[in-house]
A protein has these predicted regions:
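A conserved helix-loop-strand patch within extracytoplasmic ligand-binding domains
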Residues: 1-41, 140-144
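Ligand-binding "clamshell"
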Residues: 1-2, 83, 95-109
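Short Pro/Gly-enriched coil loops immediately N-terminal to beta-strands
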Residues: 4-12, 106-116
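A local structural motif
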Residues: 36-39, 57-70
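Short helix-initiation/N-cap motifs at beta->coil->alpha
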Residues: 44, 65-77
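Short helices/loops that flank or line small-molecule/ion binding pockets
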Residues: 54-59, 72-87
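An extracytoplasmic/periplasmic, membrane-proximal ligand-sensing/linker region
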Residues: 57-62, 129-176
Length: 176
């Protein structure tokens, strides 16, 4: 691994803005005493992971009214259609911005970090040692917010990932 890029694409819980305002939700702990009023609409994978819903319920003492796992892409639609009140997401997901969702702070640091870092084969690095210096120029330069914006361009606006990445690198002065 080379140096991390700076963003953490970890799990998060998200709610609609109206729900966050009505219940004054800012952190996952805020759900603790009232989770029984909410429908949880997690992805199937998140629902069955110890570092997902299973462990989260224990760590935060959550007891949702109902848990209805859904396909990953459908969880946002279900949330916006009020078929669920809380969903899991990734912190760099562009759909969070598309739907104007409130991401609840993981105030107990339950979710493990998922830092992005370039991975390169040693034989490739020996053949092209300049790659390490070039790739490390991006170390700690891409925030969660920036990555979410880039993902938004791809996932919401349907833009080509390579084009979006190239535009970012040009705008930040890494390439011409």
């Amino acid at each position: 691994f080379l140096k991390p890029l700076g963003f953490n694409n970890t799990y998060a819980l998200a709610v609609r803005k109206d729900t966050a305002e009505k219940y004054n939700l800012k952190s996952i702990s805020d759900l603790s005493g009232i989770s029984q009023e909410f429908l949880m609409g997690p992805t199937i994978e998140f629902a069955n992971r110890e570092d997902g819903l299973l462990g989260l319920n224990k760590a935060y003492n959550l007891n949702f009214k109902d848990v209805k796992p859904v396909d990953g892409g459908l969880r946002y639609t279900a949330l916006m259609n009020k078929e669920s009140d809380v969903i899991d997401a990734f912190t760099t997901d562009g759909l969070l911005d598309k739907f104007g969702l409130e991401v609840l702070e993981d105030d107990k640091n339950f979710f493990p970090p998922y830092y992005a870092a370039p991975l390169i084969r040693m034989d490739t690095l020996k053949e092209h040692p300049e790659l390490e210096e070039v790739l490390n120029l991006l170390a700690n330069k891409i925030t969660d917010k920036t990555m979410r914006k880039l993902n938004y361009e791809v996932d919401v606006n349907g833009r080509d990932p390579e084009t979006v990445a190239n535009e970012f690198l040009v705008s930040e002065g890494y390439i011409d």
